[in-house]
């Protein structure tokens, strides 16, 4: 059935001849529209080679390519003969099409045109973030050493800079600043020019302060905004108290405050700095008689008393705002500020000098080592495009440049793409409301500028809005609109959430599907506003416990599912639920709480690889080998299960030498203890390997000598632990292959990964599909879930970027704190105050967009969980104050100063509900008065269910465990004896099934199909009454000898050779390995990695493998590389009597196995499975032996066939292909 597109979707598909910006809101079918646009262009004769399609992740590019391939194949089935050939050509060239990340495309330009800029083509991409940081650190260390040199002409200025941010012995802070400044510059096409301009705000030109660009452009707007908001607040108070005679003096006091604010507003426009400062310092007393005796004693004036109390709070708020101005911008007079600016200019000038020196040195080092990093890609590609001939050539290659997720683009990437464009063929798709990658230098203003410009009638370019939301149940969409039509505008959020920017509910759900937008507020008693670590933990635990309880209850309900029959409803499954968080910090507690409640979980993207016990211990061993004079790693290694020194032995080591470090004490202790001496001998052996710079050999030697791999296999989660250790070996090999060597540098590399929040996920293992998914909001972007939970909604926004001695903001530049050397006084410069305010707006805007992403992930039900203190939060930032001020606000959007005061998603949400009817919140926070009308853009049809729960009443649910009840008094009733007799006399109905293995491998049960009587001839067991009875379990008697029993004299078994041959065929690259030498190389690598025994390797028939690789069937495999599956595991249930003729019942048996390989032909919807066999076949009797071979494995292969047929519904699984390697024949098994 063809997709029915909306009017705007159709426009987005068909429009051409302009630059086009598609503003695609959440759930608007953006990807479907993109693919349809591409397909329509292809059907009109435009080749996929004529498209440049860029997005921001490799996964997104891969998905785009796959979806386009599926769409072409679909059209191919219904195409006429004239189109078929063209579409088939498109499928052939699709793998080489320009569908990639922007960096990948820039790399392609460099690889093709490197000669234009004189670049050595033998470069390596520095894609490892930790490796790049290490190289940066080494280069920076050398650069700083040069500036520390007294002979350097900038030495004195440099020392002043160092002392402003630390001291020569502790310049870590300065190093971080230089690296961060460099990163900002690298995200721009004009990086060097941007750095040079950072001095400008600090230049003292002699002109009055209020005439400088810094004041006119930045400081004055901030002052006027604050004053405007305060005047508005004062006017609202005056309206409230007008006509109340008892508050006449209060009215006079507010008139005085109003006159004061109006005076400052005027002077900010024209007065010199010192005159303005004097006016601001002359604050009115603001004394009000808000609680006179007459008001208190008259019960009829209780409402007036409440108003008076509120007014007092408003006065406190006004004074607080003015005090913040006085203690920041107006802390100094003009002469003092100019002195601070002058000295700060010297700091900034030196900082830029050092940063430029670092950038140049880093660039030179990369060239010398033939390295390119990701920022280089865009810069060098632009340098190539500066050649006019090359630029015109590249521009002529593309009919259209399609940019997905355009809101996440940075300035350098924008410049690159516009350089490739011919000026009217850019097709940009995105949603600025979902721009959440500011930490990667994403520039949402690039989107918003076009959003406004392209909407103008005189513009040659066009904007198309896709606002229809086909994902979320209408109530979720309406509440999302209710919130954002009040908090997101151009000043906070970068776009006014109104008109076309709003979501339009279009999702088709039946009326009986529950409309759930639930807010759980946990109320906690607290006397102090400042939270201790214990309070944070208890608050978090309470939220997680409540969340677990909600999930368990949801499992008893139903959700809508279009695939469900007959009513479209089915029970809620764990996999329907996602928990989205702002950060990963609470994951350990969250997972623990959910699992304790019996809820399975799957955690996405948690970097905890280096924290796993088995890997952490290996890193400690490496640290000890590199430098044994580290007490903590050494003690950890000794105490570990590998060496098993107990507390008494550790104490004895310390006693052996109390004066020196622990390593020296261990050496002394080893003179009288063999166990300690053995440890020293091992460390010495490993150190000798380490000195040879063979990191890979060292790690494997540790595994060999300690049997650590085998040990962890016996621990809980043993397979995962072994995978982690194998992964460490692979990381080391990759590191070493990248021309790096040395244990010390590898340890630094790992520590860089850890300290840079770049920890890796554990080695991949199969995950439980039926589990609640836990991920960050960032990771959830682009995904959707039937039910979404948002815990820790009260968590304060991260303000780390607003702190520190130097702040950087892409538009305002850098703000520095100047430390006066003599007085050691730290003074935030005016520029720093401006930058800090800009950073706060930028950070709050990003948080607002993150909130939008979080809310729009939910399809049917959304649950918010947060905690609130009922005491301790004083002043105008208290939740009650925010509620009241929001309730009394005028206009569509809540006042900006209120939105900036709120510091959590919960506060924004509650503020948005203040002007709606919500009885629970009004009873809790309100004053009983009716709210002001909310703006016309805000829908009032949505329903928010609010639940208030005391934290002390929450208890985490625990999964129930069934067990027998204990009788404590030792007495038993007749009912107990009857129950016991029933249990003892119980006859199990399926006794035969207990004598049959419920879990059987295909390689074992294939013997039954080979000889049906074999089941009767299996090992018999003797029962207690002396009767013989078959065990009904198939066994493989041939087991490899353990290493300590194998002296090398025993010839490897044929099965061992067969296993090794299978391993080679499992790992071989059909497209590259096609010679005897290449197969032998792979075999030798597997021997070196100890995956094939040295005694087995010579027995592998290389010629047989090569003959197969050159066969027609191998060519079929190569043609289906994209759909080829090797070593595919499966499991399926079969009735026992289908396998065991001796059984009468049909009790289920779990069959598991591994298929050597199969490939899928999407065009014909068929599957071909194949299986390698190394059995000996006699050439003289080849037909007879092949017939026996076919009979021997027929049952096994038919089980594989059944398994694939169950997995691929709608596909036809053909006859299995048995590959007899010994004679190079492929047999079709009927």
Swiss-Prot record:
It catalyses: Couples ATP hydrolysis with the unwinding of duplex DNA by translocating in the 3'-5' direction; ATP + H2O = ADP + phosphate + H(+). GO terms for cellular component: cytosol; DNA helicase complex. GO terms for biological process: double-strand break repair via homologous recombination. This is ATP-dependent helicase/nuclease subunit A. Keywords: ATP-binding, DNA damage, DNA repair, DNA-binding, Exonuclease, Helicase, Hydrolase, Isomerase, Nuclease, Nucleotide-binding. Heterodimer of AddA and AddB/RexB. Residues 500-782 form the UvrD-like helicase C-terminal domain. The heterodimer acts as both an ATP-dependent DNA helicase and an ATP-dependent, dual-direction single-stranded exonuclease. Recognizes the chi site generating a DNA molecule suitable for the initiation of homologous recombination. The AddA nuclease domain is required for chi fragment generation; this subunit has the helicase and 3' -> 5' nuclease activities. GO terms for molecular function: 3'-5' DNA helicase activity; 3'-5' exonuclease activity; ATP binding; ATP hydrolysis activity; double-stranded DNA binding. Its cofactor is Mg(2+). InterPro entries: AddA (IPR014152), DNA_helicase_UvrD-like_C (IPR014017), DNA_helicase_UvrD/REP (IPR000212), P-loop_NTPase (IPR027417), PDDEXK-like_dom_sf (IPR011604), PDDEXK_AddAB-type (IPR038726), Restrct_endonuc-II-like (IPR011335), UvrD-like_ATP-bd (IPR014016). Transmembrane segments: none annotated. ATP binds at residues 24-31. Belongs to the helicase family. AddA subfamily. Residues 3-473 form the UvrD-like helicase ATP-binding domain. It comes from the Bacteria. Its EC number is 3.1.-.-, 5.6.2.4.
């Amino acid at each position: 059935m063809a997709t029915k597109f909306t009017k705007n979707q159709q426009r987005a598909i068909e429009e051409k001849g302009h630059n086009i910006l598609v503003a695609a809101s959440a759930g608007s079918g953006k990807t479907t529209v993109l693919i349809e646009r591409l397909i329509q262009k292809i059907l009109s004769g435009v080749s996929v080679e004529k498209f440049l399609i860029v997005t921001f992740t490799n996964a997104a590019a891969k998905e785009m390519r796959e979806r386009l391939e599926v769409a072409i194949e679909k059209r191919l089935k219904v195409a006429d003969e004239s189109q078929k050939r063209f579409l088939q050509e498109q499928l052939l060239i699709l793998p080489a099409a320009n569908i990639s990340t922007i960096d990948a495309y820039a790399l392609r330009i460099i690889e093709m045109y490197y000669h234009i800029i004189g670049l050595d083509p033998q470069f390596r991409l520095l894609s490892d973030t930790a490796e790049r940081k290490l190289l940066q650190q080494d280069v920076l260390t050398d650069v700083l050493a040069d500036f520390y040199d007294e002979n350097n002409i900038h030495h004195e200025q440099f020392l002043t800079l160092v002392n402003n941010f630390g001291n020569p012995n502790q310049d870590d802070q300065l190093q971080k600043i230089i690296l961060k400044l460099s990163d900002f510059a690298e995200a721009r096409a004009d990086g060097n020019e941007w750095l040079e301009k950072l001095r400008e705000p600090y230049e003292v030109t002699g002109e009055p302060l209020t005439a400088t660009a810094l004041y006119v452009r930045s400081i004055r707007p901030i002052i006027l905004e604050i004053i405007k908001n305060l005047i508005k607040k004062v006017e609202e108070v005056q309206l409230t108290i007008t006509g109340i005679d008892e508050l006449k003096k209060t009215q006079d006091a507010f008139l005085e405050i109003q006159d004061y604010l109006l005076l400052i507003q005027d002077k900010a426009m024209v007065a010199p700095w010192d005159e303005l400062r004097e006016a601001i310092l002359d604050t009115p007393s603001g004394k009000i008689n808000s609680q006179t005796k007459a008001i208190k004693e008259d019960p009829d004036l209780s409402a007036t008393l409440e108003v008076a109390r509120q007014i007092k709070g408003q006065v406190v708020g006004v004074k607080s705002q003015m005090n913040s101005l006085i203690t920041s911008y107006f802390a100094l007079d003009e002469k003092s500020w100019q002195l601070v600016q002058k000295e700060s200019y010297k700091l900034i000038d030196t900082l830029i000098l050092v940063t430029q020196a670092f950038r140049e040195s880093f660039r030179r080092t990369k060239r010398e080592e033939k390295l390119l990093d990701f920022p280089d890609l865009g810069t060098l590609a632009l340098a190539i495009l500066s050649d006019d001939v090359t630029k015109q050539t590249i521009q002529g290659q593309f009919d259209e440049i399609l940019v997905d997720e355009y809101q996440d683009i940075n300035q350098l990437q924008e410049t690159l793409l516009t350089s490739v464009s011919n000026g009217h063929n850019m097709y940009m798709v995105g949603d600025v409301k979902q721009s959440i990658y500011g930490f990667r230098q994403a520039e949402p203003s690039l989107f918003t500028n076009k959003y406004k410009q392209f909407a103008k009638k005189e513009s040659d370019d066009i904007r198309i809005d896709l606002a229809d939301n086909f994902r979320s149940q209408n109530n979720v969409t309406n509440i999302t609109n209710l919130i954002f039509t009040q908090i997101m505008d151009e000043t906070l959020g970068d776009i006014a959430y109104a008109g076309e920017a709003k979501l339009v509910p279009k999702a088709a759900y039946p009326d009986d599907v529950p409309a759930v937008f639930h807010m759980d507020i946990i109320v906690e008693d607290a006397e102090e506003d400042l939270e201790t670590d214990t309070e944070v933990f208890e608050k978090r635990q309470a939220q997680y416990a409540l969340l677990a309880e909600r999930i368990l209850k949801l499992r008893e309900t139903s959700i809508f599912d279009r695939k469900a029959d007959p009513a479209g409803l089915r029970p809620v499954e764990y996999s329907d639920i996602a928990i989205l968080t702002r950060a990963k910090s609470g994951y350990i507690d969250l997972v623990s709480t959910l699992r304790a409640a019996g809820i399975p979980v799957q955690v996405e993207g948690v970097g905890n690889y280096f924290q796993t016990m088995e890997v952490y211990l290996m890193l400690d061993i490496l640290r000890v080998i590199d430098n044994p004079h580290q007490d903590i790693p050494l003690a950890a290694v000794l105490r570990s299960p590998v060496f098993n020194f107990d507390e008494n032995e550790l104490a004895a080591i310390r006693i052996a030498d109390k004066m020196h470090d622990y390593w020296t004490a261990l050496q002394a202790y080893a003179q009288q203890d063999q166990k300690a001496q053995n440890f020293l001998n091992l460390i010495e052996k490993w150190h000798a390997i380490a000195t040879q710079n063979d990191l890979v050999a060292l790690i494997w030697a540790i595994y060999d000598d300690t049997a650590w791999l085998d040990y962890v296999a016996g621990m809980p989660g043993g397979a995962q632990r072994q995978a982690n250790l194998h992964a460490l070996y692979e990381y080391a090999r990759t590191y070493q292959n990248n021309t790096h060597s040395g244990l010390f540098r590898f340890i630094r590399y790992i520590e860089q990964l850890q300290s840079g929040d770049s920890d890796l996920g554990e080695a991949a293992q199969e995950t439980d599909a039926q589990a609640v998914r836990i991920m960050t909001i960032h990771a959830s972007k682009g995904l959707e879930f039937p039910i979404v939970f948002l815990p820790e909604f009260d968590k304060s926004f991260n303000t780390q970027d607003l702190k520190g001695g130097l702040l950087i903001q892409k538009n305002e530049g850098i703000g520095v704190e100047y430390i006066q050397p003599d007085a050691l006084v730290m003074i935030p410069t005016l520029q720093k105050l401006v930058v800090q305010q800009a950073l706060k707006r930028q950070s709050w805007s990003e948080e607002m967009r993150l909130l939008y992403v979080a809310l729009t992930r939910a399809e049917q039900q959304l649950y918010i969980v947060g905690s609130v203190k009922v005491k301790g939060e004083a002043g105008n930032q208290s939740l009650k104050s925010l509620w009241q001020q929001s309730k009394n606000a005028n206009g569509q959007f809540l006042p900006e100063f209120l939105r900036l005061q709120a510091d959590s998603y919960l506060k924004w949400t509650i503020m948005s509900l203040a002007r709606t009817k919500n009885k629970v919140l009004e009873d809790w926070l309100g004053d009983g008065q009716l709210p002001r009308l909310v703006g016309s853009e805000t829908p009032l049809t949505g329903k928010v269910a609010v639940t208030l729960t005391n934290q002390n009443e929450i208890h985490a649910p625990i999964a129930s465990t069934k067990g027998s009840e204990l009788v404590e008094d030792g007495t038993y009733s007749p009912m107990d004896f009857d129950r016991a007799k029933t249990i003892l006399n119980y006859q199990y109905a399926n006794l035969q099934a207990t004598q049959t293995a419920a879990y059987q491998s295909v390689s074992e049960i294939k013997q039954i199909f080979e000889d049906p009587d074999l089941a009767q001839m299996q090992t018999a067991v003797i029962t207690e009454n002396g009767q013989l009875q078959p065990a009904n379990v198939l066994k493989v008697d041939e087991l490899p000898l353990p290493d300590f029993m194998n002296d090398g004299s025993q010839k490897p078994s044929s099965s061992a050779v067969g296993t090794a041959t299978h391993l080679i065929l499992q790992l071989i690259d059909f497209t590259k390995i096609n010679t005897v030498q290449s197969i032998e190389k792979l075999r030798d690598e597997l021997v070196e990695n100890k995956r094939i025994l040295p005694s087995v390797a010579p027995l592998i028939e290389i010629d047989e493998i090569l003959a197969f690789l050159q066969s027609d069937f191998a060519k079929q495999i190569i043609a289906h590389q994209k759909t080829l599956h090797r070593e595919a595991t499966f499991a399926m249930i079969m009735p026992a009597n289908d396998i065991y003729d001796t059984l009468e019942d049909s009790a289920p048996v779990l069959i598991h196995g591994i298929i050597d390989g199969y490939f899928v032909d999407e065009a014909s919807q068929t599957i071909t499975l194949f299986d390698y066999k190394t059995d000996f076949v006699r050439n003289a009797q080849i037909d007879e032996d092949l017939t026996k071979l076919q009979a021997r494995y027929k049952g096994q292969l038919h089980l594989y066939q059944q398994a694939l047929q169950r997995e691929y519904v709608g596909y036809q699984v053909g006859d299995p292909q048995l590959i007899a390697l010994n004679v190079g024949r492929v047999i079709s098994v009927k």
